[in-house]
C-alpha cells in the first residue's frame, strides 16, 4: 500500500482508526497530527534479526526501531505511522522509524462445506457491509477489508472468508459474518486481513479478478478486486486470528 496523506482520509475513517490506535489521546495544542493517524497499510515481516514492512509488491521498509519478535514474530497486516530516515540499506528500499504500529485481525480463509446451507450453519449469514476505503485492498497476497456490521457489545462476532464456493472459479469467495446472537444495537466498523497465499491458485505473475460476495444490509452484493499472487519469498509462519485490538471479533 502506498504511503497515505492522512489529510485525504475521510472523517469516518479517521475516527475509526483513531479509536483503534489512540483510545486515550490527549487533545491539546501540542499534538503532532502528522503522527496521530496511520500513513500506510503494511505486512509486518522478519528476516533474521531484522523486522521489515512490506509497503507494496515492490517496496520494503526496514524498521530499525522494531524487533523481529513484535507480534510474537508472526506475519500480520498492520496500520502504521512511520517517518523516513536518511539512512540507506542495500537490502531494503528505505530505512524508517516507526512512530506507532497496530496490528489488524489477520487470518486464513476457510473452505466451503459444499452448500450455502452448510456454510450458513458453520460460518453464519448475518448482514455485513464492505466499506470502500483506502484500507480495503488486495495486495501482497492479502485481501484486507474494512467492514461494517450491527453490534451489541455482548457477544464475540466471527468474520470469515470462504473459498471454493464456485468450482468453476477458484478466485470467487464469500465474506461470512456470524453475529453469534449479539443484539443489533449500533453500527460499528472493523478491519480484517485474509491471507490468500497458498489458498487460492498462484496467478503466476498475472493479475486476475478476485470476486467477493456478501450479504449486505441492502441485499446480496459482489465486487471484483485486482489480485496478483505474492512474489516467491521465504515468509514467516502465519498467526491465525492475531489481533492486538478487537477482542470481540475473530
Regions flagged by a language model, labelled:
Residues 20-24:
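C-terminal motif of bacterial Sec signal peptides marking the signal peptidase cleavage site
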Residues 11-19:
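Hydrophobic helical h-region of N-terminal Sec-dependent signal peptides
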Residues 2-11:
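Bacterial N-terminal signal peptides that target proteins for export
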Residues 2, 35-250:
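First exposed extracellular module after export/assembly in secreted or surface-exposed proteins
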Residues 26-29:
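Bacterial signal peptide processing site
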Amino acid at each position: 500500500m502506498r504511503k497515505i496523506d492522512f489529510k485525504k482520509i475521510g472523517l469516518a475513517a479517521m475516527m475509526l482508526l483513531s479509536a483503534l490506535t489512540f483510545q486515550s489521546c490527549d487533545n491539546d495544542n501540542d499534538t503532532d497530527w502528522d503522527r496521530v493517524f496511520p500513513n500506510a497499510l503494511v505486512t509486518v515481516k522478519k528476516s533474521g534479526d531484522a523486522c521489515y514492512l512490506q509497503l507494496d509488491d515492490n517496496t520494503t521498509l526496514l524498521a530499525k526501531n522494531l524487533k523481529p519478535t513484535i507480534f510474537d514474530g508472526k506475519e500480520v497486516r498492520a496500520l502504521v505511522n512511520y517517518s523516513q530516515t536518511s539512512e540507506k540499506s542495500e537490502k531494503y528500499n528505505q530505512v524508517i522509524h516507526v512512530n506507532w504500529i497496530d496490528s489488524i485481525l489477520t487470518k486464513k480463509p476457510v473452505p466451503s462445506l459444499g452448500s450455502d446451507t452448510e456454510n450458513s450453519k458453520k460460518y453464519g449469514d448475518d448482514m455485513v457491509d464492505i466499506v470502500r476505503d483506502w484500507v480495503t485492498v488486495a495486495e501482497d497476497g492479502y485481501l484486507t477489508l474494512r467492514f461494517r456490521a450491527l453490534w451489541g457489545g455482548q457477544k464475540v462476532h466471527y468474520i470469515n472468508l470462504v473459498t471454493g464456493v464456485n468450482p468453476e472459479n477458484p478466485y470467487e469467495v464469500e465474506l461470512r459474518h456470524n453475529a453469534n446472537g449479539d443484539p443489533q444495537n449500533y453500527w460499528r466498523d472493523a478491519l480484517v486481513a485474509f491471507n490468500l497465499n497458498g489458498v487460492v491458485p498462484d496467478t503466476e505473475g498475472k493479475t486476475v479478478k478476485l470476486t467477493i460476495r456478501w450479504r449486505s444490509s441492502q441485499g446480496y452484493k459482489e465486487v471484483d478486486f485486482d489480485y496478483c499472487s505474492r512474489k516467491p519469498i521465504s515468509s514467516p509462519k502465519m498467526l491465525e486470528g492475531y489481533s492486538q485490538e478487537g477482542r470481540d471479533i475473530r
